[in-house]
UniProtKB/Swiss-Prot annotation:
It comes from Neoponera goeldii (Ponerine ant). One of its GO terms (cellular component) is extracellular region. It is found in: Secreted. This is M-poneritoxin-Ng3f. Expressed by the venom gland. Belongs to the ponericin-G family.
Amino acid sequence: GLVDVLGKVGGLIKKLLP
């Protein structure tokens, strides 16, 4: 769902930005 996509994007951003 949309929330799942947002969660994935948020996780990637957290990994890229320490």
